[in-house]
């Protein structure tokens, strides 16, 4: 019987553009955040992303990328304009972030991380 073998893969010498380098750096995932988010806000974001994908706009390829972008914008000075709805149901959600964003997230006040993160998502969605 013949033994199956694999041929070695060829390594290509690829050069990255500045935009690709930023994207590679931004997607270097190091940590994970879990929190309880407003279900209605989450559904609005999901629906918007789905409609953008149907239109061919893949600026935010998935929900986690949107969350990372929102936290990154807040880290660089985005003003929080969104007011939380305390009576809306909550859903536990988690997403992965870069080491830089994890350091920033851990520096936020301990008792208000969930509130701040929800306001960050709402403010980023509304802009």
Predicted regions and their residues:
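A detector of short terminal or domain-flanking linear segments
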Residues: 1-89, 96-127
């Amino acid at each position: 019987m013949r033994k199956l073998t694999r041929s070695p893969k060829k390594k290509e010498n690829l050069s990255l553009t500045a935009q690709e380098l930023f994207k590679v750096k931004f997607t270097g995932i190091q940590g994970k955040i879990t929190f309880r988010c407003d279900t209605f806000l989450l559904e609005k974001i999901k629906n918007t992303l789905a409609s953008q994908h149907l239109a061919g706009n893949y600026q935010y390829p998935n929900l986690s990328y949107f969350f990372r972008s929102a936290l990154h914008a807040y880290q660089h000075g985005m003003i929080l304009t969104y007011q939380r709805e305390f009576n809306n149901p909550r859903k536990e959600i988690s997403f992965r972030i870069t080491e830089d964003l994890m350091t920033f997230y851990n520096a936020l006040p301990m008792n208000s991380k969930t509130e701040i993160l929800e306001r960050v998502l709402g403010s980023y969605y509304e802009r």
